[in-house]
């Protein structure tokens, strides 16, 4: 992935994962990539990859089960559609 210089890398990677949630690559209740998998796929630092998961959790798109990993929230597709609609309305 080629990163845009003016946007934090964690936000760019989060956008990719968000798109994958939206297109069904990661359906509700499915596991999302671990921090280490994000590091391997995108070539970013571990701390940056951890920010990806924190950001997606804050948006309500993923949740974590201790010892199990992070998963797509059942409400994630609806939340993404609402956020995109709000962006269009605001723009």
Task: Please place each PLM-identified region on the residue numbering.
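Extreme N-terminal segment that seeds HTH/winged-HTH DNA-binding domains in transcriptional regulators
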Residues: 1-44, 54, 63, 74-91
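DNA major-groove recognition helix of helix-turn-helix/homeodomain DNA-binding modules
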Residues: 59
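Short Lys/Arg-enriched helix C-cap and helix-to-coil transition segments
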Residues: 63-65, 69
